Amino acid sequence: YGMVKPSPDCTPSPNSGWLPMPERVDGFAQVHVSGTGGGPKYGNVLVTPFGDGMDRVNHYDYRKYETIRLGYYDTQFKQSGIRTEITTSNRASFYRFTYPEDSLKSLAVDAGFFLGENPVPDAREAQQFVGSEIQVLSDHEVAGYTRIRGGWNNGKAYTVYFYAETDRPFVQSLTWKGNRITEAQSQYDSAEKTGALLRFAKNDKVVQLKVGISFLSMQKAKFNAHSEIPHWSFEKVHQDLLGQWEQLFQKIEIDPSTPLAKKRMFYTGLYHTCLLYTSPSPRDCS
């Protein structure tokens, strides 16, 4: 319930990003919609934990299992053994990555990824890449934007700005433009896809990540991340989100004597009515 809706993004890519196992996972993007019909929309700012070398930009994997609850997602990759847990605030995603002891600890941030890419230029209801930018700001921070057009509404170009911060420092950071990986710490917009590869220390088994999103600026994305999640407690973020859902569910009460099956059906329907809430809110539009 909010502007940020993190999800695994699978191939072939559906509108909501997620597909059942055994489809592969390209990573976890921050902005999604579901139930729209038509061509895919959004699927922006992909983050992917990986455990091998920093010599390629794509690091897809397959799920060993999935656990999905209200406000919480958990999976483990088969090949790398990396566990990913996700929860959110309204405008910021929160991740907890747990790496195997003997694994390299790395993370890719892809500013150019989006759902529904079609090799046919201007294919009906396909999204098309317009531009992207990424900057490594410090040994904890990465920021940038992605600009995409098209999708189910054949819409004009939109820009999603992001700010990503980890609780552990990078010991190495590279960036890419197209498929060219370099030691440069910034890649500016020149109509090619950009991203960053981040390496953590060998003993950093658990790495946490905040990703703030804004449709206005990178500064707003940073503000959203810091104001909504000013700490590093995964459990607190999840509990705060559950509290928000409880407030929504309490808006409509049904007779306590209603059979459990009907209660479940009713509140599931009420939950579904809230899934497409994506308003940036006055704070992000001022």
What are these regions (language model features)?
Residues 1-279, 283-286:
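Accessory carbohydrate-recognition regions in carbohydrate-active enzymes
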